[in-house]
Amino acid sequence: MGRRRKKRTNSWFTGICLILLLPVFITTLMQRMQLENLIYGKDGVQGVFTTADSEKNMEGEIRQHLENRKSLLAEQTETTDDGRKEEDDAVEIKILQIVAQEIGVDKPPETIKAQCVIARTNLYDAMQAGTKEPEKMTPERQQELWGENYDKNYQKLKSCVEATAGEVLLYDGTYIYAAYHAISSGRTRNMSELYEDADMPYLVMSECHADTTAEGYLSVFYYEKKEFLEKCRAAYPDAELTEPGQIEIKSRDAAEYVTKINVAGETYDGEQFRHALELPSACFSITEMDSHVRIVAKGMGHGFGLSQNTAEELAKEGYDYREILEYFYKGAVIGQAGNL
C-alpha cells in the first residue's frame, strides 16, 4: 500500500513540474523564433540548395544587365548615416541567405567568400535596376538541411559574409554580370563568342583543369530514337522531325560549348537546346547508334564566369578569395557598394 502511494505521489510531482515548465519552454521557443526573424528577416524564398547557376533565363539576365548599365541612376537616394547602416545591415542579412542557396557550406572559407562577393554584386545590381533579386534560402530551410550542424554552418557563413562586408565586383565603375556555375568543360567561356554585343570583357576564358576530374563532370544519356524525337518535337513543335540525323551541331566556341545547332533545317542556340533536353551543360555531343541516341555532356552549368569546383581547388592551393575572383573575372576590381 505504501509503495502504491509513493508511486502515485511521484507521478503527481512529475506532472506538476511539466505544467510549471511548459510556459518557460514556450517562451524560450518564441524568443528563439523572434531572434531568428530579426537576424534573417522574413522575405526569404523557400528553396532547395543546388550548386548550379541562375540559368533558367540566362539570355534574359544578360540583356537585363546590359539595360541596367544603360540606365544607371544619376542620383543616389539620400539617407542619414543611421539609415544607410540599417540598409547595409539588411543587405548583408540577405547575402547570407543567398550564399546558403548558391554554394555548399562545406566548401573552403575562401571559396565561400568569393561567392559572397558574387552574390552581393548580383544583389546590388538587381536592387539598383529594380529587377528580380537572387534566390534566398530561408532560415527554416537552413535548419531543415543542416539539422544539428545549423549553428556551426550559420556561423561559418556569417563570418564569410562579414569578412567581405560591402564588397562588390566592378568594371568601369559599374556592377559586373557576376556569372558563375558548378563545373566547367575544362575551361570557362568567352561571353563575346555567344553575344557579340555584350560589353563584358571580364568574362573571358580561364583554364579549369581540375574540373575534368570532378564528380558530375561527365554525364551520359541514352534515348530510344522514338523518345529522342518526341523530346525534340516537344521543344520545337514547328520542326518536321522524322529522324535523329536531322539534328546537327553547327558550331562550338573555344571552350567546346555548342553555340548553334540545326534542327530540321532551322538554326537554334545551343543553350536553348540544352535546356529543352534538360542537359547539364551545352558542352555536348550527339551520336546516333543502332537503336538509340547517345548524348555526352561535360560540366554543369552555362560555363561563364566562376567555376565553383575550380574555385574550391584554388582555395585548397592557397588562393584567397580576391585572387580567386581575379582569376575568373579578368579586369574587374573589388570595390565598396556604398561608394557607387
Put a short name on every predicted segment.
Residues 14-30:
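Hydrophobic membrane-insertion alpha-helices, especially the h-region
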Residues 86-89, 106-117, 222-223, 301-305, ...:
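Soluble non-cytosolic domains of exported or imported proteins
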Residues 1-11:
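N-terminal Lys/Arg-rich, disordered targeting/topogenic segments
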Residues 92, 109, 116, 121-293, ...:
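Extended substrate/cofactor- or partner-recognition/assembly subdomains adjacent to catalytic sites
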Residues 100-104, 117-128, 233-237, 315-319, ...:
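Sec-exported extracytoplasmic/periplasmic mature domains
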Residues 92-109:
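Zymogen propeptides
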Residues 271-340:
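C-terminal soluble interaction/assembly domains
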Residues 33-89:
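N-terminal, intrinsically disordered, polar/charged segments of Gram-positive cell-envelope systems
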